[in-house]
Amino acid sequence: MIAIRQGRETGVDGIQALHEIGCTATLRQAQPLEDGRYDVVTVGTQRFRLAALDDSKAYLQGEVDLLTEETGDEAAAAQAARVVRDGFRAYLSALGERGVTQVSAPELPGDPVTLSYLVAASMIIDLGDRQALLAEPDALHRLTAERTLLSRELTMLRTLTATPAPDLRNSPYSSN
């Protein structure tokens, strides 16, 4: 899976319309809807860098280079994980106070790599922020970026009493 930079189609822009980093995905659930579409749940499994596109077939296909998963400096990553774990619990609590989520803070993983992906997947952030996290070279850099994002989001939740809004640009039009 790889995100399109803008809109729903790559159009004539090809590789320029796509983000450079994506991830392989495992299908967890596919539920048919009455209108013929499917509600699909996937889990990202391994990051990759898009190397080339092949548009000679009916569906656009890409050639990718799989990326290794690094922790970064072990001691610094462990410290960053402690800070992010606390910040993420505070974030979930603040969302709960605003009625956005009723999920209590789960038992968070101790492994910095796993924690970094759990936090990235769970935060209510826009595609640009989510893509930036995916593109970080290792868990330490991802956790450092998450610490900044958690601080920003907590400040907005506490100061502005604002709740994150979903990205409506890619949603079907509704007059409601």
Positions of PLM-derived features:
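N-terminal low-complexity, acidic/polar interaction/targeting segments
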Residues: 1-176
